[in-house]
Amino acid sequence: PDELPTTLSTLMAKAMNDQSIPPGEGILHHAEGIDLIPANIELAGLEVSLVNCMNREKMLKQVLEGAKHDYDFILLDCTPSLGMLTVNALAADTTLIPVQAQYLSAKGLEQLLQTVQKVRRQINPKLKIEGILLTMTDSRTNYGQQIDNLIRGAYGSKIKVFDQTIPRSVRAAEISAVG
């Protein structure tokens, strides 16, 4: 993504500078039918600029506006933080909350849910939580089972916790290192 002429940070910078974004700009089309807008480390730097931007909570929505009618779903993969980019992603219609099956991630879930409530009150009252998806699970260990039970027990009565989980995979870690 570092060599690509257009990334998500390029598009968001255009939106922040009130420049038009042609529909489809920056979208890469994969042969398997999945399209994506790549991002790179520049996006983290752009987040600092968002703080001083008017309508800063909706810049990402503005970027995606021209393309949203071409898709049934647009998935936004956010970093595990509660910064301005995550708030921008919460301008979506719905959110699916992935949570690593680890203690600190489970603790961070409460903060994220508080942020979602604040976004509902102040920015996007229609935001719906689709559910919680447990990731990096390892049902073979007591610890993995305890975290699974902890999240289901604490949130399962209020928010759907999907039965399907994404297991821990060494292969996934290897692939992410390649890019």
Label each residue range with its predicted role.
Residues 1-179:
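P-loop NTP-binding core
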